[in-house]
């Protein structure tokens, strides 16, 4: 599995596309908007850059990037207003006006065509609206893994990444498809039957990747620059108890059913491990501290959202099951299919896609009928001193 080559969200605008099934991420972007706005205002007020470089890492091709761009622009306009200074050109004071360069980054397989069509449509829509002036801004794409260097040293003022850093740069070292015998039989992530030694391989891959990510971004950030990072995690320290564990265990069970039906070779399943890991807040804080880098943590928090991206109910302690598990299971299946499609097709072939996620939907309905499960999200803001 070559993650840089193979991994991307489902393209286009159809029923199964990521752009049509990313509402959960959209809700989270709104949930963390105050965090982004605060970071933008702090960077602007402290540095007063003439050109402010803002990078969205793992932008995908859904509407969430447009929400992020809008949030940054409105925050700059508000910060400029607080300083009694218009954010865009005019008059003799142009040397003090900021221009923004947005850099939208994702892997080369991302649907950048759809992304930039959406950006252009937003440009046109915004041009026809009366709103407070915002600074001039420019948008470019950068197809590359964020586990590589992306920018010159000390050139970026703000990094943003939403629902990406749970993904690893590769399958855990030691679990590659070519290795025999299979060490994580019938599983594709950390499950109840995963041995502690295999769970440790997933943890170590996260530690390696996240430490590298911090190092690279530290080199690229200006002093006083910030990173707002939002990603899936787990709510306690038990590596076997995360919400992702339950979710991907159901995907594995769906694939196992295809093996029993003769649609998938058992060896194929045994050689498939997802490049993913949901850390705890404690693990994240420890890696930031261990890095020895000049990062201060402005904020770190976690919050939960229902598996069903269209279920916004708070779900108090008395509500333990989903009221309409059949409907919710369809929404969950569409979301996970839009995320995993490229990896499943690359490894098992497109012919199994419908059968796999039909069975997954059935399993999710059964699960949600017994237990209302939530995603745990970690949100953090780091400042480079």
Curated annotation (Swiss-Prot):
Record protein name field: Benzoate O-methyltransferase
Function: Methyltransferase involved in the biosynthesis of methyl benzoate in response to stresses. Utilizes exclusively benzoic acid (BA) as substrate.
Residues annotated to bind benzoate: 25, 167
Source organism per UniProt: Zea mays
Sequence positions that bind Mg(2+): 184, 270, 272-273
Entry's Gene Ontology BP terms: defense response; methylation
Keywords per UniProt: Magnesium, Metal-binding, Methyltransferase, Plant defense, S-adenosyl-L-methionine, Transferase
Family per record: Belongs to the methyltransferase superfamily. Type-7 methyltransferase family. SABATH subfamily.
Gene expressing this chain: OMT8
An annotated Gene Ontology molecular function: S-adenosyl-L-methionine:benzoic acid carboxyl methyl transferase activity
Catalytic reaction(s) noted: benzoate + S-adenosyl-L-methionine = methyl benzoate + S-adenosyl-L-homocysteine
EC number: 2.1.1.273
Disulfide-bond pairs as recorded: none
Binding site for S-adenosyl-L-homocysteine: 18, 59, 64, 106-107, 145-146
InterPro entries xrefs: MeTrfase_7, MeTrfase_capping, SAM-dependent_MTases_sf
Pfam families xrefs: Methyltransf_7
Cofactor names: Mg(2+)
